[in-house]
C-alpha cells in the first residue's frame, strides 16, 4: 500500500468477490466526504421524492454518464461516524457478475473517486480509531478463514478480545512503571519500594504473556492449515483414498496403473485444521511423455507438502518400488497407509520399523479414514494436547509479545543484580513499546504498510 495515498480522497472499490461466474449480488463501496454526492450522481431512486437517510436502503437504477441504465440496484448511505471507517460510507448493491459491477465502479471513478488500495478501508477504520490493529488483522483473518475454528478465533479478535487483553497488560505495566518513576522523582517523599510485592506483580504479568504466547502455534495451524500430498506407486489406491477422505469423487479410479496423470486437489477440515489434499500421479519410470510430466510435477509438489501420505498395496506387500519412494521421502513428516488390508496375506507385511505413523485402510470402502485423521493430528501437533482457543496470536503479534517478555526478563535480571531503578524503567518502557506495536498504539508507517498491503481491495 502506498503510504502517500491522500486520506482526504474519497475511495471506491468492489467489496465482494469478483469471479468469472455470475454472482447473485455485487457491492461497490465508497468512503470519504464525497461518497454520497458521487452515489447521488449515478444512482436514480425509483421514488421521485426519495430522501437520502443514513442507514436506509433506496431502490432504483444505476446510470452511466449518458443517462443509460446500467443496472437495477439498491443504494445505502452511512453517515460518519456511524460507519466502518468513521467516514461517510456509501454502497451500491448491484446484480453480481463482472461486467455490471465493474461498470458501476467505473462510474464512481468518473465522478471523482479514487480506486482504493488493498486494505485501505480497514486502514482508515484503524487511523480513525474505529478499530485497533488486532481487530484490523482479524478482518483479514475472518475473510481468509478456512475452518469454523479459524473463523471463531478471527471473530473474537474482531470483537476486540485480543486487543483488550493486550491493553490490560499495558495498564498493569504502566502501574509498575509509575511506582518506579515516582520514586525516581520523589524518592524523599515516598516510602521504600516493596520490591517483593512489585516483583510478584511483574511475574504475574509474565505468566499472562506466556499464556498468550502459547496460543500462537495452534492459531497459526488453524489459520494456514497443512498441505498433504498422497504419494506412492501407481494403482495402490491413492485416488480411492482421496475420494474417501474428501467425501467426493474428485479423482478417477480404475484398475489401470497411471490413470492419474496430473495432481488432483481437494480441501477439507481435519479436527479443526484446514487441509489441502493433493492426489499425485503414481511414481514410476514411464515412456509416456504425458505421464512422465505428471510424475515430475507430483515429485515437485511432494517436496513442497507439509505432510506426505505414502500409500502401499497390502496385497502386493512392501515392494522394491515402495522402498525406492520411501528412501526419497523418509526424512519428511510421513504417514504410511497400508491400503487393501482386506486382501492382505494372513502372515502380515514386513515394514520398515522406523515408520511411526501407520494406518491400515480399505480406501474403496472408506475404512481407515478416522485413524488417518488421528495420525495426521498427532503428526502436525507432535502429540501435544491442543487447547480450544478463543483467541490466538499471529506471527507478527507473537514476535512483538516475545520482545515484551524479553524486556521483562531483563527487568528481573536488573532486580537480581540490584541495579538502580533507572535500569528497571528502561526495560519496562521497552516492554510497553512492544505491546503497543500489537494494538497499533506505537507502530511505524512501514509496518502498517506491510500489514494492510496483505488485505484484498475493498476491505
Curated annotation (Swiss-Prot):
GO biological-process terms attached to the record: tRNA methylation; tRNA wobble uridine modification
Gene that specifies this protein: mnmE
Family, per entry: Belongs to the TRAFAC class TrmE-Era-EngA-EngB-Septin-like GTPase superfamily. TrmE GTPase family.
Positions bound to (6S)-5-formyl-5,6,7,8-tetrahydrofolate: 29, 91, 130, 459
Cofactor annotation comment: Binds 1 potassium ion per subunit.
Chief location bin: cytoplasm
Enzyme kind, highest EC tier: hydrolase
Gene Ontology annotations for the cellular component aspect, listed alphabetically: cytosol
Coiled-coil regions listed: none
EC nos: 3.6.-.-
Chain's role: Exhibits a very high intrinsic GTPase hydrolysis rate. Involved in the addition of a carboxymethylaminomethyl (cmnm) group at the wobble position (U34) of certain tRNAs, forming tRNA-cmnm(5)s(2)U34.
Binding site for K(+): 235, 254, 256, 259
Gene3D superfamilies hit by this protein: P-loop containing nucleotide triphosphate hydrolases, Probable tRNA modification gtpase trme, domain 1, tRNA modification GTPase MnmE domain 2
Keywords: Cytoplasm, GTP-binding, Hydrolase, Magnesium, Metal-binding, Nucleotide-binding, Potassium, tRNA processing
Subunit structure: Homodimer. Heterotetramer of two MnmE and two MnmG subunits.
Cofactor(s) annotated in UniProt: K(+)
InterPro entries, A to Z: G_TrmE, GTP-bd, GTP-bd_TrmE_N, GTPase_MnmE, MnmE_dom2, MnmE_helical, P-loop_NTPase, Small_GTP-bd
GO molecular function: GTP binding; GTPase activity; metal ion binding
SUPFAM superfamilies linked: P-loop containing nucleoside triphosphate hydrolases (SSF52540), TrmE connector domain (SSF116878)
TrmE-type G domain ranges (all copies): 225-381
Name used for this protein in its record: tRNA modification GTPase MnmE
Subcellular compartments: Cytoplasm
